[in-house]
Amino acid sequence: MRFSLAILALPVLAAATAVPRGGASKCNSGPVQCCNTLVDTKDKHQTNIVGALLGLDLGSLTGLAGVNCSPVSVIGVGGNSCSTQTVCCEGTQFNGLVNVGCTPINVGL
């Protein structure tokens, strides 16, 4: 009887275990950014087109690059929401137009 009770309690305890989660409006490397476009730098055709339009050599980049990004200080407050792609970027910028090392985040706007 005790063994079956322990077996039943195990999934309940596992489900109740707290899992740490990062805040939706914070990035470890800087503010949340709202980017008009995300470019996967593995797609060299897309990277070359964006680079040519902006006058930048993006060929050596890896990961995602956010194009035309602006910081979002408080998500959803005062009209400061993002209708395109919300990302966290590692902070490297080119001419203020391209952020590299970006990771999309879901903030439920």
UniProtKB/Swiss-Prot annotation:
Organism name: Schizophyllum commune
Compartments, as annotated in UniProt: Secreted; Secreted, Cell wall
UniProt keyword annotations, A-Z: Cell wall, Disulfide bond, Fruiting body, Secreted, Signal
Induction or repression: Expression is regulated by the mating-type genes in the secondary mycelium, and especially activated by both the MATA- and MATB-controlled pathways.
UniProt record similarity statement: Belongs to the fungal hydrophobin family.
Single GO MF descriptor: structural constituent of cell wall
Short name of one Pfam family: Hydrophobin
Subunit structure: Self-assembles to form functional amyloid fibrils called rodlets. Self-assembly into fibrillar rodlets occurs spontaneously at hydrophobic:hydrophilic interfaces and the rodlets further associate laterally to form amphipathic monolayers.
One annotated Gene Ontology cellular component of this protein: extracellular region
Disulphide bridges, residue numbers: 27-88, 34-82, 35-69, 89-102
Keyword Secreted: yes
Organism taxonomic ancestry: Eukaryota, Fungi, Dikarya, Basidiomycota, Agaricomycotina
Signal sequence annotation: 1-22
Biological role: Aerial growth, conidiation, and dispersal of filamentous fungi in the environment rely upon a capability of their secreting small amphipathic proteins called hydrophobins (HPBs) with low sequence identity. Class I can self-assemble into an outermost layer of rodlet bundles on aerial cell surfaces, conferring cellular hydrophobicity that supports fungal growth, development and dispersal; whereas Class II form highly ordered films at water-air interfaces through intermolecular interactions but contribute nothing to the rodlet structure.
Protein name as annotated: Class I hydrophobin SC1
Entry superkingdom: Eukaryota
